Swiss-Prot record:
Protein name, per record: ATP-dependent Clp protease proteolytic subunit 3
Annotated Gene3D superfamilies: 2-enoyl-CoA Hydratase, Chain A, domain 1
Subcellular location field: Cytoplasm
Coiled coil: none
Biological role stated in the UniProt entry: Cleaves peptides in various proteins in a process that requires ATP hydrolysis. Has a chymotrypsin-like activity. Plays a major role in the degradation of misfolded proteins.
Organism encoding this protein: Frankia casuarinae (strain DSM 45818 / CECT 9043 / HFP020203 / CcI3)
Chief place of localization: cytoplasm
Amino acid sequence: MLGGGAPRARHVLPNIVERTSRGEYSMDPYSKLLKERIVFLGVQIDDVSANDVMAQLLFLESEDPDRDISIYINSPGGSFTSLTAIYDTMQFVRPDISTICMGQAASAAAVLLAAGTPGKRFALENSRILIHQPSAQGEGQSSDIEIQAREILRVRALQETMLARHTGRTETEIRRDTERDKIFSADEAEEYGLIDEVIMSRKAARLLSARSA
């Protein structure tokens, strides 16, 4: 995988102070985004980040099951089991899920980008999207390695099915294209079916989402 690994947030984020009729209160930027029904996935996808995303999706559904949720993605990918946990939650909750790539959506993150509600999947102009086969390492006794090999084949087939479902490509095409890293520009990702539109402003995203509603 190209790049420098998982992006890391600064240890100390500046708080945002809001003034209301009840006085002032402060919150971190992620809480402010959540208030606006935005989930930000800006780290490697693992059990911790997956649980965070799932909890936010379920919370926002309970707050208003009829309003869209946006997931902003800048992630190098990560664990396949963590991917499927987020993916299944996205399909489970009632609100439409708008996905927006800001920077990169690689590997597992590319699947989540594609899994947004049709017509509401976007990427900023200079985004980078990468798809490839899930990877795993076999260790242990020969019988264990055989079990792991079968699991690798199952996982690869499942990812091919997911990408085929959301891109309109055949599973055969997906299998061929993920034999090695396949890197897309934002425009190429749109042509492939991973996203619906390349956008340059929030206003454009809102107009396109309204049009597809």
